[in-house]
Amino acid sequence: MSVDQETVKRVSHLARIAIHDDEIEPMTKELNVILGFVEQLNEVDVNGIEPLTSVMPMALRMREDSVTDGDKVADIVANAPVTEENFFLVSKVVE
């Protein structure tokens, strides 16, 4: 895969990055070099190798899931000017 000047313009527009006409050609070359490095990574044989989440061995601590209200209801509704039965009361905005 290679990047052309139109692709650079399109990507810069989508990313909302201002790029001047004199910067398009060098950017095209730079992106093609980067893609070349990525294509080299595709040549590496990784069959039989487990994916890593970290270079340090980690064990997941398991716990039983339990549903709670967070014990913060009083703190949360304390910020509202008007509440009813632990719900915020607001004026009707749609008729």
Swiss-Prot record:
Keywords: ATP-binding, Ligase, Nucleotide-binding, Protein biosynthesis. The keyword Ligase applies. Pfam families: GatC. Signal peptide: none annotated. NCBIfam families: gatC. Heterotrimer of A, B and C subunits. Belongs to the GatC family. This is Aspartyl/glutamyl-tRNA(Asn/Gln) amidotransferase subunit C. The lineage of its organism: Bacteria, Pseudomonadati, Pseudomonadota, Alphaproteobacteria, Hyphomicrobiales.
